[in-house]
Amino acid sequence: MPACRAQVVALVSGNGGVGRSTLATALGSGLQRLGRAVTVLELDPQNALHLHFGLPHDTPGIGRASLCKQPWGPIAQPGFCGCRVVVFGETDLQQQEDLQRWLKQDPQWLAQHLSRLGLSEQATVIIDTPAGNNVYLHQALHVADRVVVVALADAASLGALEQMQRLLAPYLARPSAPRCHVFVNQLDEGSAFSLDMLDVFKQRLGEDGLEVIHRDPQISEALAFGEDPLDNEAVSLACDDIHGLCQLLDSPPNAP
């Protein structure tokens, strides 16, 4: 089966509550505005992404479709600005355990499903993975062209960063390694502690590959109502940050 030709961006995090799904939603809209054909794929059994896109809770998803050996294309839903959304969907505990067992045995599971979507080289897939070390994370890392580690400027994210770096190390050592970025999300420049923590991140990682997204309640408010956060015409540092990050992700992975 031919490999997926689309660029694949995996959003990962060492700990939860960092705004990873929110960021996946916003990046999907932003990259679509740049002319990419974007598919936002939820690879997380928590099944929360439908809330951000204003989709019904019973939207069919990849969990049950995969167990029934059904293709993913027909369950894609319209998202913001013309992008497509493929949610995980509702699953019970037994279904989740069955799927995780399957994924452990078949590391090419995700690659095969992406290949069947028939995406072009102008397409981008944004994968929202669960926090921490899990089978969904490793499936995404097998196919990723870029890996975005999402963190907050706090001690919990800094503590989880070392574990995530260890998890990523084998994938980043491959000949065709993905490019890795760290996005510090929801930075509050009015907080001296947050700025101090950002400095610690910079000392740990260096400037290269470290990006910042400022805190903006308008982003969360828009998503709470199922609205595109980038449709807001008001001046927003966070929206400017996201547009800039979309430009970064739209550039060739080996670009400086």
Regions found by a protein language model. Give the residues of each.
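Active-site catalytic microenvironments for nucleophilic, acid-base chemistry
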Residues: G30-L34, R116, L167-P170, L248, ...
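Short, hinge-like loop/turn segments at secondary-structure boundaries
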Residues: L55-P60, L167-L168, L198-V200, E227-L230
